């Protein structure tokens, strides 16, 4: 009897010893399958990135917006706002800033109101930097700094006279160009924390625009003057801390529209050409418009500028052009459709036609299309390949 019990015990131990490896092997097999699946997914992502970075953005959007409910066209209503013809829009990250003659509001990516303020702005304008944006009144003395969380500081007290222009670079250095008693105009530079780092007073010429360059060590200012009996804009670059220009360049016979940056170069957009300078003032390149009328521009692409040109003062004979940081034309696209708005960001260019939205690559190959957009008035491109459509009182996010 005891021998029988011992035999049963021995068999039971043998079964347990044989079963344990099988359980371990099953767990190992499942683990290997999980690892294999992850490797496959990683391989797909790497292959997409190797083939086309926009495909990688598609994968990112798949995960970022997988819980967002889209309509059959792939768009989502973001928020609603007052129907005001004075509305000015800008994106700070994924937050929408709306400034009008009656106030400022910031909406999150989910459409909730992050901050709202009632304030009188005669000519509202927005300048966007890296993490902050300046909302100001052209010709007035109101200046607010916002982050995605809301109002950061009220800098209205810094304005000794009426504001002429404001710019914010990618490191959130701000250049305030304003009138000043005893001078034609004055430019003051503030760092990201709002501390004053440089002041420049112009006693002979009016400063049209000023920007802090990407290295945050230099400032570029454009003054309006005269050369050989014709109007001429002078582009001067100063080291912060010195009121003596390191370099001076003259743009003769053209009207400066804005200063900006393309791939770290200083971009001077005029009514006739796009001229680019390096940080030391050396000419990097220039692109003269093939069509005489500039209808739109965007300098927010990755290492390129997007320009919308027109053959005639009015009409729909258009040419969309991308220009590299050395002034070379990258691609061009002719169009006979009416263009309402154009915006570039990262590797994408959004063009809003009268009845459709088309997203292009920098080579002006069509990337995505949304038809039936008669409700939209303007568009703002985002770096992840999504675009914000702006209507009279609502905004939508288009997710390709």
Can you name each region flagged by the protein language model?
Residues 66-81, 110-118, 150-157, 195-201, ...:
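A short beta-strand motif characteristic of beta-propeller blades
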Residues 54, 103-105, 141-145, 182-188, ...:
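Structural motif
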Residues 1-77, 83-84, 400:
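Sequence/structural signature of beta-propeller modules
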Residues 281-372:
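Intrinsically disordered, low-complexity segments enriched in Gly and acidic/Ser/Thr residues
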Residues 96, 133-134, 173-175, 216-220, ...:
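Hydrophobic beta-strand positions that form the internal "hydrophobic ladder"
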């Amino acid at each position: 009897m005891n021998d029988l019990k011992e035999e049963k015990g021995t068999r039971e131990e043998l079964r347990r010893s044989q079963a344990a490896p099988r359980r371990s092997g099953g767990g190992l097999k499942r683990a290997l399958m999980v690892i294999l699946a992850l490797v496959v997914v990683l391989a797909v992502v790497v292959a997409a990135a190797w083939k086309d970075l926009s495909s990688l953005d598609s994968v990112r959007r798949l995960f970022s917006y997988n819980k967002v409910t889209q309509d059959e066209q792939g768009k989502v209503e973001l928020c609603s706002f007052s129907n005001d013809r004075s509305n000015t829009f800008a994106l700070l990250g994924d937050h929408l800033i709306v400034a009008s003659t009656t106030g400022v509001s910031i909406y999150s990516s989910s459409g909730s109101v992050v901050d709202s303020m009632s304030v009188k702005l005669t000519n509202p304008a927005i300048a966007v930097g890296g993490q902050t944006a300046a909302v100001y009144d052209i010709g007035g003395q109101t200046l607010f700094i916002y982050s995605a969380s809301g109002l950061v500081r009220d800098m209205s007290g810094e304005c000794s006279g009426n504001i002429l222009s404001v710019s914010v670079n990618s490191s959130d250095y701000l250049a305030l160009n304003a009138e000043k008693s005893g001078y034609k105009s004055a430019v003051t530079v503030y760092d990201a924390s709002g501390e004053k780092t440089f002041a420049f007073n112009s006693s002979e010429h009016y400063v049209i625009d000023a920007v802090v360059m990407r290295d945050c060590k230099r400032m570029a200012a454009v003054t309006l003057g005269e050369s050989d009996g014709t109007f001429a804009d002078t582009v001067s670059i100063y080291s912060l801390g010195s009121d003596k220009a390191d370099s001076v360049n003259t743009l003769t016979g053209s009207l400066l529209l804005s200063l900006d940056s393309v791939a770290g170069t200083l971009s001077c957009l005029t009514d006739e050409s796009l001229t680019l300078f390096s940080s030391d003032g050396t000419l990097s390149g220039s692109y003269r418009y093939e069509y005489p009328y500039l209808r739109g521009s965007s300098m927010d692409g990755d290492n390129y500028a997007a320009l919308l040109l027109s053959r005639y003062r009015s009409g729909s004979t258009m040419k969309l052009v991308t220009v590299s940081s050395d002034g070379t034309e990258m691609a061009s696209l002719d169009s006979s459709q009416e263009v309402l708005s154009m915006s570039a960001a990262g590797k994408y260019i959004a063009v809003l036609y009268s009845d459709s939205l088309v997203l292009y690559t920098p080579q002006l190959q069509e990337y995505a299309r949304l038809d039936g957009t008669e409700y939209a008035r303007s568009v703002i491109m985002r770096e992840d390949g999504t675009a914000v459509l702006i209507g009279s009182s609502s905004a939508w996010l288009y997710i390709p």
